[in-house]
A protein has these predicted regions:
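Active-site rim helix/loop that mediates acceptor-substrate recognition in acyltransferases
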Residues: 41-64, 71
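Acyl-donor (CoA/ACP) binding surface of acyl/acetyltransferases
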Residues: 1-27, 66, 70-144
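Helix-loop element at the rim of GNAT/NAT acetyltransferase active sites that forms part
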Residues: 23-45
Length: 144
């Protein structure tokens, strides 16, 4: 199996990102291990219709820091969210949206990039990931 090329985290959000997120959040295989609010797709649809693109980044970062996980070519393939739980402690939430890309190391690269941001740039003391034990790909991604 072909291994993933390295990825980068992009903070700037676009209308295309909103459409991709909608597609991913409507896929039960993608969301089965996420603890997202049941109204997330409704909220994304409202944003798609009513929020101008220059304001999307602001809206996605109101309660947490939100990034699109992108290939080196710039293709968005997933997302990472870092939500501050208390001063210096963040919760990480991540997903690779395209099932065809699962198991290739993209999730691991996204986690590593997010941890570098949290620990090296923000000087976080701790980052936690709430992972279901049966979510074996995520367990491997964080080295648990």
């Amino acid at each position: 199996m072909k291994k993933a090329a390295s990825i980068f985290l992009r903070a700037n959000m676009t209308q295309r990102d909103v459409r991709l997120l909608l597609q991913w959040m409507e896929n039960p295989a993608v969301t089965q291990y996420l603890n997202e609010d049941s109204t997330v797709t409704t909220h994304l649809r409202q944003m798609e219709c009513s929020v101008p693109e220059p304001m999307l980044t602001y809206h996605f970062n109101r309660r947490s820091r939100f990034f699109m996980a992108c290939t080196r070519e710039g293709e968005a393939i997933g997302f990472v969210k870092l939500r501050e739980q208390m001063t210096g402690t963040y919760e990480i939430v991540y997903a690779i949206g395209d099932e065809a890309l699962w198991g290739r190391g993209y999730g691991t690269d996204a986690v590593r990039s997010a941890l570098a941001t949290a620990f090296l740039k923000w000087r976080a003391g701790k980052v936690i990931a709430k992972i279901y034990p049966e979510n074996l790909r995520s367990v491997r991604s964080v080295g648990a």
